[in-house]
Amino acid sequence: MQLSFSAIAILLAFAVNHATADSHQNLVCVRTYPDNNSAENLEATRCACDWLKKNGKCDDCTIWENRLCHSDAKSLDGNEFEDACVRKCPNLGATGSSIPPA
């Protein structure tokens, strides 16, 4: 039984990593705190969304509902967005990105 649980855990880990690289319709930048809680980072989300649009990575990206980077064409690449949150907008405190809850 333990082997089955381990196999499932490994498969889930790969599925999560794979989903990061997928194209998305909505993403947000997040900041993770030392207690492992995280919160959406609106300033970094705006910066990352603007950076991707300005640099031709997501032509239809806009800020939606005043909190999400949104692409009708689902052209938000998870890896590119996270890179924009953390490295292209480094002074805004984002530590990663996330698919927002529905």
Curated annotation (Swiss-Prot):
Record flagged with keyword Glycoprotein: yes
Residues modified by glycosylation: 36
GO cellular component: extracellular region
UniProt KW keywords: Glycoprotein, Secreted, Signal
Top-level taxon in the UniProt lineage: Eukaryota
Location within or outside the cell: Secreted
Induction: Expression is highly up-regulated in invasive hyphae.
Principal localisation: secreted
Role of this protein: Secreted effector involved in biotrophic colonization of plant cells. Participates in transition from the biotrophic to the necrotrophic phase of Magnaporthe oryzae. Elicits rice basic defense responses during the early stage of interaction and promotes cell death in the late stage of compatible interaction.
Name by which UniProt lists this protein: Biotrophy-associated secreted protein 4
